[in-house]
Design a protein with these regions (language model features):
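Juxtamembrane/interface segments of multi-pass membrane proteins
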Residues: 4-7, 45, 236
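N-terminal Sec/SRP start-transfer signal
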Residues: 1-40
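Short, aromatic-rich amphipathic segments at membrane interfaces
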Residues: 230-247
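Basic-flanked hydrophobic alpha-helices used for secretion and membrane insertion
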Residues: 50-234
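Charged, alpha-helix-enriched surfaces in structured cytosolic catalytic cores
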Residues: 8-16, 47, 160, 210, ...
């Protein structure tokens, strides 16, 4: 009942109530959106870091772990026959000038192709002294339109000669290399020294310390000097990206997101 001298405020009260309900509803929707976005950000960050770790481990799988330099034929034979390791062999013959850049001349075997994770070779590696394989980067830089089986004239340090192009390695990024056969190396050098690219068998999941200790033991057994062996910094940088490091980063980022989310919700409750 409303007395004659009283104002009827029921309509205003209803309007205020409706406005408050609408404001509460909007605020609740904003809170839900804020929490959902924060959850999505945390999940996206987590998935990104774990995907990065998986990519690194996949990239490391099968790669060579160390290089042993200045190795003679006898030691190469011992390494190749050792069941503990995979061994890729290469000999760097030298660098030759081609125009305004240098061309690397070296040998390489099939095992090294796998351990270095080179892309699939178009054709095959050279077997005879008159066969060579070349990187695509060199052909592109030199402006040579050549295919496997073509004859190519090059000066590899002993005058310009014709060679059969037996393989093209599809790598770019200024990798100007020519690969010659083992017989070519032996014709040029009586006692060539090789580089052995080695990897321990079944070592996926091993720690850096365990791998390096085992490889050092192998070298001692074969009387290889410590200074001859060089560990692959690229390989070990890949496997050292452990889950604990990622979890720490994820936890830190999640904390920042959670704090930001809390501030947004606080402002919605107390500022609006």
């Amino acid at each position: 009942m409303t007395w004659p001298f009283e104002n009827d405020t029921s309509a205003i009260t209803k309007k205020l109530a409706k406005r408050n309900l609408k404001a509460d509803k909007s605020r609740n929707i904003l809170i839900i959106i804020t929490i959902a976005l924060a959850t999505c950000l945390i999940m996206t960050t987590t998935l990104y870091f774990f995907a990065s770790q998986r990519k690194s481990l996949n990239d490391a799988a099968g790669r060579y772990q160390a290089i042993i330099n200045e190795v003679d034929n006898d030691t190469i034979t011992k390494l190749v026959n050792d069941s503990r390791v995979q061994v890729g062999v290469s000999h760097l013959l030298g660098l030759v000038s081609y125009g305004d850049y240098k061309l690397t001349v070296r040998s390489m075997d099939e095992t090294l192709m796998k351990l270095a994770k080179y892309p699939d070779l178009e054709g095959e590696l050279p077997k005879s002294t008159n066969e060579i394989a070349i990187t695509k980067a060199f052909l592109d830089r030199a402006g040579l339109s050549k295919s496997v089986g073509d004859i190519i004239s090059l000066n590899l340090g002993d005058g310009e000669k014709d060679y059969t192009l037996c393989g093209i390695l599809p790598v770019e990024n200024s990798n100007y290399s020519v690969f010659v056969s083992q017989s070519y190396i032996e014709n040029k050098i009586s006692e060539p020294a090789y580089s052995a690219y080695i990897r321990l068998n079944e070592s996926d999941g091993w720690s850096k310390a365990a791998i390096q200790a085992e490889l050092s033991t192998l070298c001692r057994e074969l009387k290889i000097q410590p200074e001859q062996m060089q560990f692959s910094t690229y390989y070990f940088s890949l496997i050292e990206q452990r889950s604990s490091q990622y979890i720490t980063v994820i936890a830190f980022i999640s904390l920042i997101i959670a704090l930001a989310c809390t501030l947004v919700i606080y402002s919605l409750f107390y500022v609006s």
